[in-house]
């Protein structure tokens, strides 16, 4: 259908006021007008900007300044075709769009995929077409074949990408590198290999059918036409479906099971991998015939995905098929405790596709795998000989068949005889072997790979310990575990480098047979495991909660199956099981009693040695860390808190007996000593905490912790076996509730102790520092609290010296005013810093006088502090960052690149923030625009805050600016730090305590004493006044002046305004004026006479000079009153020779020029909002001189149009230093921008000076 034949719905564009930019098709304008749209000639009045060229300056100006929607003409055409107004954000012509300048040709994709890709590309600024011609910049093709592909491949101007490129670019909101998405990166396998694995994967596919339905919602319409999820494609790399196309599926991050990826995959464009063949995806390592080997070898998306999988992306429980994970957990229940306890990204079993991708392993890798599997093989043999349970032969046979089936599914290419499950640590070694050494050099994950290599060495040591503890006789298991607990400090020292609190692999493998027996025998173990999981969640990190959901679900399913099997047992079998359980308990009790006596004697000797070593190490720590006492206390508390968490875990999983308590005490004490030695030598950078005198010694906290531990042990009533080998009897529901209640009480006591300790210490955590308040009033003092100081003399006893300010003050009269105010309120000012000085007024900490003042314990403050105490009428310690000298030299500008704005602060707080920004060198704007770099918020709300979030402007608290003033220049680079995003602070302008040095506060810790003689000298003159009756001096007041009684004709009635006089004088002049029949002008525009003593650049003078007929002296009114009629003005014209010489003008000549022709007649002014004087003042001055003010910023094109066309009025731009960012476009186009003096001096001299006041 032709565009001119389309009928525009009535009132479709009724609310649209459009401003066309550039040359538009007349048909577009006709459509808009047919829909009742209105065309405006000025963009500030428009609601929509219609432009084809996104680089036009008017487009950026409309978007940045006026925040107007800018759309292409196609928005109008397509809206008319669709019969409804389409959203504007899909038709932006600006170059900031993701696919701006992209013309893509789609080939070899299905109609549904083509529609999706077409919509995404065009919505984000690109164009799509089906024909491949010279206009095309990109060819989107899923596989490297076809005529279009061959044509584009021969021409380097056309970039060839897969559909992944579109989806990933939209997802990450930036155009991705096309080289990573070339279809030739796909490598095909031979047909024979596909046939070999077809049968195995069909079997696995049938078992994973339920998982396909479960996860199919995560696949996108582009990536899955048949509904199969991406992660299932990876778990079965070869599919036997005959309806698949023969392209290859590239690796991408869409299979990443991390929460960020899952959230991204749930968007309306979740697809990240195009629908292509299910051929196995491998790393490209130099395919034959590759014309671009450098690109493919080092930039392959497969490397990126494999890297993510290695770094914990896909090696998780969630990617395992549910039935496989269920049976694996049934067979190896001992791994449950490890999975619940350890928050490690490398959990679960690796996906089967990884084994399909593994190249032949190196000899070193095979040696590591064999070494890690050897002790596990011993465990399996031990498990076969262990009397697990008396099950029926059919059940045992079925269980063995399930084990073999799982082993074949999970390990199709790497099977080991007599191994039913893989060791959890061994599983982590396979993905790491897939990275090529050359690729490691080009990957940012080299550090991660080095971390895996370090784990190899650590695991070899762990396996050596494991071989020592694994014995073929079950009755010696308990003794071996107790010996291992004695060796635990060395093992914990190794595990501390891994930063985990997990059990050793030797403990897990040694406990597997007994734990499996326990799970097969106990009907109530499901409740107990749930209870233990809930208790562990309180002490472990919250991240474990994300993984425990699926783990608990699979575990419950396995336990239910076990219970169903237990129901089929005969009563004789159940009775036999109970008898075996009782016998095991009796044997363990005897062994515990015999070992207890031996360990008691050993413990006494070890305790004495530990105390001796602790004292020595404590003394050594104090000597080594003498310069950092606060850091050692922070580190001590961190160790103690870690020990409390370890005690909680051990109390949940070990027996309550005296033996375990002694071993735990011994183990923790030795671990604490080793950690102290390590951390004393490697003390991290900590912010020193003040108030260190309130720190509790570490030994005292250790005693409190031990006492609490002794109190906790009797409360735990749950029978447990030592070292995790538990043969628990079933607990009644009431006993379990009581047990849970007791544990909660103990944990509550632990939390209270930790909270008390955290309140006493002051660590450099972001939110704690942000909420810390300035030094408390009881610590810092002004005057002696016991002496009452009169409010009028609140500076009594203060002797000031002034530094920095005299050099920076051009007006010496201001400094004299300061001295007069100090003396008026009882203080004195010395010319130089002397011994009797008590205060130093200075701006910066970088001066010799400041250093001397600190050395002599003087109170160093700024003039802003003096202003604050003048308002309070009391000498108080400095309480805001503005009251302390800045940490950089005077005139230093660390924030010179920042343009700040403020929201939520009012009155004095807002004024202080302006001053702080000025001291830091930042530009301040009362408004918020896209050019602002920082928004300082009091609370996260308001229109400015919402706009700042929309425009991605950092929002910080006032603490950010306080830290910069006090020397923490790292805040400039760490503007997104969490300490600066804590809002609603009690005193947001208070300084950070760690930045206010003790030297700066030492003088304020001693109150300033005033001698009684000085106080008596102040109070003596007051006593006579107290005896006399209180006689208040008469305060002159302005009387209500009656209106004029004498009436004159309107032409003869003068309308007068006064400027530069005292209010009482003005009152007398108004009386005389009313008697003579004159009137006081309401506004400057209505005045005929201006009465002034001298030329002053006040608002009244600068406005009246353009409209008043006469500017006269007060003598004119006096003489008129004497003669009872208005005298001739020519004899009383104001003449100010000094001002006329200063500004190079003649007042009389200026008045004549203004009467003949107003200075700004026929001229438009745009004044930026941050101008000084205020915008309202400037508006009044300009309008009195005949000019007009533009409320919206004109575009560059509009200014040039008015400049070139003489018939149009001239547009003059007035701005200030803080608003120059709004004029960047004008500077780029060589348009002059002037400061306020162009207007102020111009109206005074009645001359236009285009050269003297423009910004360069």
UniProtKB/Swiss-Prot annotation:
Residues 217-226 have a biased composition (Polar residues). Its main location: nucleus. This is PAX-interacting protein 1. Interacts with smad2 via its last three BRCT domain-containing regions in an activin signal-dependent manner. Residues 231-249 have a biased composition (Basic and acidic residues). InterPro entries: BRCT_dom, BRCT_dom_sf, DDR_Transcriptional_Reg. GO terms for cellular component: nucleus. It is found in: Nucleus. It comes from the Eukaryota. Residues 188-205 have a biased composition (Acidic residues). The keyword Repeat applies. Keywords: DNA damage, DNA repair, Nucleus, Repeat, Transcription, Transcription regulation. A motif (Nuclear localization signal) lies at residues 857-874. It comes from Xenopus laevis. The keyword Transmembrane does not apply. Residues 8-93, 94-183, 794-883, 890-978, 1053-1134, 1155-1196 form the BRCT domain. Involved in DNA damage response. Promotes ubiquitination of PCNA following UV irradiation and may regulate recruitment of polymerase eta and rad51 to chromatin after DNA damage. May function as transcriptional cofactor in TGF beta signaling. Accentuates smad2-dependent transcription. GO terms for biological process: DNA repair; positive regulation of transcription initiation by RNA polymerase II. Residues 184-295, 366-387, 701-782, 1025-1049 are annotated as: Disordered. Residues 701-773 have a biased composition (Low complexity).
